[in-house]
Amino acid sequence: MTMSTNNCESMTSYFTNSYMGADMHHGHYPGNGVTDLDAQQMHHYSQNANHQGNMPYPRFPPYDRMPYYNGQGMDQQQQHQVYSRPDSPSSQVGGVMPQAQTNGQLGVPQQQQQQQQQPSQNQQQQQAQQAPQQLQQQLPQVTQQVTHPQQQQQQPVVYASCKLQAAVGGLGMVPEGGSPPLVDQMSGHHMNAQMTLPHHMGHPQAQLGYTDVGVPDVTEVHQNHHNMGMYQQQSGVPPVGAPPQGMMHQGQGPPQMHQGHPGQHTPPSQNPNSQSSGMPSPLYPWMRSQFGKCQERKRGRQTYTRYQTLELEKEFHFNRYLTRRRRIEIAHALCLTERQIKIWFQNRRMKWKKENKTKGEPGSGGEGDEITPPNSPQ
């Protein structure tokens, strides 16, 4: 499947100065009998070092880029095309530079290619020595390459060092057209990341700044909640798909988010000391007792022991009313308070009156006088 000479020439004109390798023009194997190609039409890295006026295809410029960067024989639009070519075939193939065709043979050895690259390197060094002032102005700009990626078009020193390193190494694996845009993109990316990082770090703080109105520590309770939902909960409007506010923190740790909300279900008679004392959870209605404030101090019924009841009955049999001194003595003897002794005697007198009233109705009133203690003040 060999192609004719006309077809080959049309293909080379179609691909614009034959950016494909020399071994890819006439099939998979070189040396297939077609040797009538013009080597001057092929612009490779190792040929035409002094063709400033006859510029090759901008997608594949030669090694001597110094005159083009300084503005000699190349306008700004073409220079922009040199920089912005992300899909170069040299980077797609793997960065291997095509071999030049010399003396009617295909596949020049790599050592001869290095020898052909040396004149272009000497020319670059001469141009660098002729413009020492430009180099001194551009050397400080190398340190500012990360912060100012737009100034890379004015820094030929960086590209000159890369070309010299690629020529001395003789490997040619560094794609000339792919590395500078990659550095440009990476430096711009890191610069944008550094510029946007403090913005995003300070953004939640700015959005959570309104939580200082009534909520002490919202970030500890709900870091994963959306700020919009938090704002709606503060304004009294629950977010879409959110559970009720009364059930939001039931069973969780510190539900501090609902202490200052207008839509809280806690009744207005909540103890104000619960918030100021630093309690971990507010006092919900089911935690409160069913009695009012005045009834909360009511004590339960005192259960007297059999010994206490026996001693009190003995004292009541002799005296219905007790003096202050006797009340204190009985309180110390029975380990009770004076109030308990006084209440017990009051209840016991009411019981005694009921008993006397029922007993005095069927008979005479003399029976009631017999039950009355003799020393009781009536």
UniProtKB/Swiss-Prot annotation:
Keyword Repeat set for record: yes
Region feature (Disordered): 48-132, 230-287, 352-378
Highest taxon, organism lineage: Eukaryota
Entry keywords, A to Z: Developmental protein, DNA-binding, Homeobox, Nucleus, Repeat
Residues passing through the membrane, by range: none
Gene Ontology CC entries for this record: cytoplasm; nucleus
DNA-binding residues (ranges): 297-356
Biological process, per Gene Ontology: anterior/posterior axis specification; anterior/posterior pattern specification; heart development; lymph gland development; midgut development; muscle cell fate specification; negative regulation of transcription by RNA polymerase II; neuroblast development
Localization (cell): Nucleus
Molecular function GO terms recorded: DNA binding; DNA-binding transcription factor activity, RNA polymerase II-specific; RNA polymerase II cis-regulatory region sequence-specific DNA binding; sequence-specific DNA binding
Keyword DNA-binding: yes
Residue ranges annotated as motif Antp-type hexapeptide: 283-288
InterPro entries: Antp_homeobox, HD, HD_metazoa, Homeobox_antennapedia, Homeobox_Antennapedia_CS, Homeobox_CS, Homeodomain-like_sf
Ranges of biased composition (kind: Low complexity): 101-132, 243-281
Gene3D superfamilies linked to this entry: Homeodomain-like
CDD domains, per database record: homeodomain
PROSITE patterns referenced in this protein's UniProt entry, alphabetically: ANTENNAPEDIA, HOMEOBOX_1, HOMEOBOX_2
One Pfam family cited in the UniProt record for this chain: Homeodomain
Family the UniProt entry places it in: Belongs to the Antp homeobox family.
Note: Loss of Antp results in altered development of the embryonic thoracic segments. Overexpression can cause antennae to be transformed into legs.
Function: Sequence-specific transcription factor which is part of a developmental regulatory system that regulates segmental identity in the mesothorax. Provides cells with specific positional identities on the anterior-posterior axis.
Protein name: Homeotic protein antennapedia
